[in-house]
Swiss-Prot record:
Reaction catalysis annotation: N(tele)-phospho-L-histidyl/L-threonyl-[pyruvate, phosphate dikinase] + ADP = N(tele)-phospho-L-histidyl/O-phospho-L-threonyl-[pyruvate, phosphate dikinase] + AMP + H(+); N(tele)-phospho-L-histidyl/O-phospho-L-threonyl-[pyruvate, phosphate dikinase] + phosphate + H(+) = N(tele)-phospho-L-histidyl/L-threonyl-[pyruvate, phosphate dikinase] + diphosphate
Family listed: Belongs to the pyruvate, phosphate/water dikinase regulatory protein family. PDRP subfamily.
Protein name per Swiss-Prot or TrEMBL: Putative pyruvate, phosphate dikinase regulatory protein
InterPro entries listed in its UniProt record: Kinase-pyrophosphorylase, P-loop_NTPase, PPDK_reg
């Protein structure tokens, strides 16, 4: 009995530490996201979750964002905001919640300003040309945020692609990545004993992507999530029998729909996105 406990403790120690990188921007947030990604790849033993909040252009949107991210543990906030009034609440929140925070733009802007003796324009998104491609991306990002987690079933009928998957199969970050490439994406979490919206059965099956993973991988991720919240890792959420049942149920639905299935285990979201774009014969402009 003692040996089993020791083995369990050792397993928990080797599980990946969860880090939630929050990207807040008054524009599309590509600069902040790319910098965060470049830094995060230096930590392969961490489970890094990217949570993007683009187009936060007023105090009301920012307040809602800060309220939402309060639920996540181990926060690293990366922000790109030109309006100082929107920077201050982020800094205050980070300090109150003992979160690390990084201002991507201000130090560079200040350095250029001091060198040139010029004042910055303060124009949001000035580095983007106002092209159809740019506006399509903005529209797609807004669409992905609006129809994340099955918030409104009507989004399934308007989407270019619909992602289905059990909890922790990278639906949201994948949606945002595809949106950044111009695709309108909606996603639906497959929760046990929950009704599937009728709209799912009305969609062209070629537009539906069923996400699955390996049971052991999902077990590890879910256990670590419980540990990061200070909870018992051995719950129904992380139980292998429950996980197998969830994955089997999801696969049965995918078979019924006749949709394209991707196993995301040990696969980066960039690789998964490439497979989806290839399946859709979609070429980024």
């Amino acid at each position: 009995m003692t040996e089993n406990k020791a083995e369990n403790k050792q397993t928990e120690k080797t599980e990946k530490m969860e880090v939630n990188i929050i990207i807040i921007s008054d524009s599309a947030g590509e600069t902040a996201f790319n910098n965060a990604q470049a830094a995060a790849v230096q930590f392969p033993d961490a489970e890094v979750n990217y949570r993007r909040y683009p187009f936060i252009v007023n105090e009301k949107k920012l307040a809602a964002t800060l309220e939402e991210i309060e639920q996540y543990p181990n926060l690293v906030i990366v922000y790109s905001m030109l309006d100082e009034k929107l920077q201050l609440p982020i800094i205050k929140f980070a300090r109150e919640h003992k979160a690390r925070y990084i201002d991507i733009l201000s130090p560079i802007i200040e350095a250029i300003s001091q060198t040139t003796h010029m004042k910055p324009t303060g124009l949001v998104g000035a580095n983007h040309q106002l092209t159809n491609k740019y506006f399509n991306r903005i529209s797609a990002m807004e669409f992905a945020v609006m129809y994340d987690d099955g918030k409104d079933p009507r989004g399934f009928l308007e989407a270019d692609v619909v992602l289905l998957g059990v909890s922790r199969t990278s639906k949201t970050p994948l949606s945002l990545l595809l949106a950044n490439k111009g695709l309108k994406v909606a996603n639906l979490p497959l929760v046990p004993q929950t009704h599937i919206p009728k709209e799912i059965y009305q969609i062209d099956p070629t537009k539906i992507i069923g996400l699955t993973t390996d049971p052991q991988v999902l077990n590890r991720i879910r256990r670590q999530r419980m540990i990061s919240y200070g909870m018992d890792p051995d719950t129904a959420y992380s139980n292998m029998d429950s996980i197998n049942a969830e994955l089997d149920s999801a696969m049965a639905l995918y078979k019924k729909l006749g949709c394209f299935v991707i196993n995301v285990a040990e696969r980066s979201i960039e690789e998964t996105a490439a497979l989806i774009m290839n399946h859709l014969s979609y070429e980024e402009d």
